[in-house]
C-alpha cells in the first residue's frame, strides 16, 4: 500500500487537519464507550508534541445534515479530551472560513455532518476543509469506506494528504489476517444485520477454514435447516442463500438456543433445542451446547477474525453466548482481530481489550475491506502519493 504516512512528515508549525473517528456513544452529555477516542489519541498526541497547529474533526450520530443539533455535538468528546490530555481543548462551531490555532494547540471542529454537502462529498465543502490546513491526515478507518467531503474530497485538494498511524496500522493488521493467515483461520460473523453480512460470509468462506455465525445471521441459518424461528430476527428471503453457504462451507449452525417471549432486559431466558421453538418465542442467544462447540473451535484457531456478537449481550440474561465466545478468543493463542461497534462494546463489557491482538475501529469499513472492496479514502491516499 503506497501512501504518504504521517509518521514520515515534519509537522512542526504546520496546520494539521486530522479526520478521526470519534463517533462514540453518548448518554446525558457523557461518552459511554471511549474505545474509538482512545484509538485516535496517539495520532493527536504525536501531532501536538511536534508543535503542529492541530484541528481534529469527526461525525457523531446521524443528525439532519446542514443543521446544528446539540444532541449530536462533539462537546462530550471535547470534555473527554480535556480530561485525558490535561489541557484546554476548544470546540470550533463556525470554522469553514478559517480558524486560528496556536502551535501545540488542539481545536476540535464541530460535527462534520452539520455541514451541508458532507455526505455527498461536495467539492466546494471539500475545498473549504482543504483551505484550513497544510496537511490533511486521514485517520478514520471506520469511515474510509465512505466517499464524503471530510474523508475523501478534502484529501484531493489539501496541499498534502497522508495516512494517520491508526488508519495505516488497521490496514496492515487486516492485511496480515487476510492475505496470508496462520491456519486454521476462524471467522465469526454475528450481529443483527443479516443482508449486509451475507456477502462478507461469501468472501470469508473462500479464505477461512471455519465460519461461525451468531445473532440474527445464525437465526437465518437455523430457519434454513427447516426449523421454526418464531418471532426471531431473521431474513426469510435469504434462506436460499444460507442453504447455498451451508452446502459449500463448514458452518456450525446452533443446535440449542436461549429464547424469550419478549424482547426486553427483564425477559426470562429459556434454554431450548432449535427444533422446539414456538411461534411466540424469539432467539436472543446461543445455548450451552452450541457455545461449548464454538469455544472448542476457537481454542484450536491460529487466526481469528471477529465481527459481531452472537446474542443480545446488552441484556444480562442473554449475554452468556457472547461472553463465552469473547473469553475463548481472549484465551486463544491465535492472532485475533475484532471489529465493529457492537463487538467493541462487548470487548469493553468483558474487559478483554488487552487480550485481543488487534481491535479495529471500523464497522462497515472493516466488512468492506474483508470483502475485498477498495475503500475510497485509501484509493485517494494512494493517488495523492503518486503526485
From Swiss-Prot:
Main location: cytoplasm
Keywords tagged on the record: ATP-binding, Cytoplasm, Glycolysis, Kinase, Nucleotide-binding, Transferase
GO BP: gluconeogenesis; glycolytic process
Family stated for the protein in its record: Belongs to the phosphoglycerate kinase family.
UniProt: ATP binding residues: 197, 314, 340-343
Location of this chain's protein in the cell: Cytoplasm
Record SUPFAM superfamilies: Phosphoglycerate kinase
Catalytic reactions on record: (2R)-3-phosphoglycerate + ATP = (2R)-3-phospho-glyceroyl phosphate + ADP
GO molecular function annotation: ADP binding; ATP binding; phosphoglycerate kinase activity
Keyword Oxidoreductase part of the UniProt annotation: no
Name of the protein described by the UniProt record: Phosphoglycerate kinase
Pfam families per UniProt: PGK (PF00162)
Amino acid at each position: 500500500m503506497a501512501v504518504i504516512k504521517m509518521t514520515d512528515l515534519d509537522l512542526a508549525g504546520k496546520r494539521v487537519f486530522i479526520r478521526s473517528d470519534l463517533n462514540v456513544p453518548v448518554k446525558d452529555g457523557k461518552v459511554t464507550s471511549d474505545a474509538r477516542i482512545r484509538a485516535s489519541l496517539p495520532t493527536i498526541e504525536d501531532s501536538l508534541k511536534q508543535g503542529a497547529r492541530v484541528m481534529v474533526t469527526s461525525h457523531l450520530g446521524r443528525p439532519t445534515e446542514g443543521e446544528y443539533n446539540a444532541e449530536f455535538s462533539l462537546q462530550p468528546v471535547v470534555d473527554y479530551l480535556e480530561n485525558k490530555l490535561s489541557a484546554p481543548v476548544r470546540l470550533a462551531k463556525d470554522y469553514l472560513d478559517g480558524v486560528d490555532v496556536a502551535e501545540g494547540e488542539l481545536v476540535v471542529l464541530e460535527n462534520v455532518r452539520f455541514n451541508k454537502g458532507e455526505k455527498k462529498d461536495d467539492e466546494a465543502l471539500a475545498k473549504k476543509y482543504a483551505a484550513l490546513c497544510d496537511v490533511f491526515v486521514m485517520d478514520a478507518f471506520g469511515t474510509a469506506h465512505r466517499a464524503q467531503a471530510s474523508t475523501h474530497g478534502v484529501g484531493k485538494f489539501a496541499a498534502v494528504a497522508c495516512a494517520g498511524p491508526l488508519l495505516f496500522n488497521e490496514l496492515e493488521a487486516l492485511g496480515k489476517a487476510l492475505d496470508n493467515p496462520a491456519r486454521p483461520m476462524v471467522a465469526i460473523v454475528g450481529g443483527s444485520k443479516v443482508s449486509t453480512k451475507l456477502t462478507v460470509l461469501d468472501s470469508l468462506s473462500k479464505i477461512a477454514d471455519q465460519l461461525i455465525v451468531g445473532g440474527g445471521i445464525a437465526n437465518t441459518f437455523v430457519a434454513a435447516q427447516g426449523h421454526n424461528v418464531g418471532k426471531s430476527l431473521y431474513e426469510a428471503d435469504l434462506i436460499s442463500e444460507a442453504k447455498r453457504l451451508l452446502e459449500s462451507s463448514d458452518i456450525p449452525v446452533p443446535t440449542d438456543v436461549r429464547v424469550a417471549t419478549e424482547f426486553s432486559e427483564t425477559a426470562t431466558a429459556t434454554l431450548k433445542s432449535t427444533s422446539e421453538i414456538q411461534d411466540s418465542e424469539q432467539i436472543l442467544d446461543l445455548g450451552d451446547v452450541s457455545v461449548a462447540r464454538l469455544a472448542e473451535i476457537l481454542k484450536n484457531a491460529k487466526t481469528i477474525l471477529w465481527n459481531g456478537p452472537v446474542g443480545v449481550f446488552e441484556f444480562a440474561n442473554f449475554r452468556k453466548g457472547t461472553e463465552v465466545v469473547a473469553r475463548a478468543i481472549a484465551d486463544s493463542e491465535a492472532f485475533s482481530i475484532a471489529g465493529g461497534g457492537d463487538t467493541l462494546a462487548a470487548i469493553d463489557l468483558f474487559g478483554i481489550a488487552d487480550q485481543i491482538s488487534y481491535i479495529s475501529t471500523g464497522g462497515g469499513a472493516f466488512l468492506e475491506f474483508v470483502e475485498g472492496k477498495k475503500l475510497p479514502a485509501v484509493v485517494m491516499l494512494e493517488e495523492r502519493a503518486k503526485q
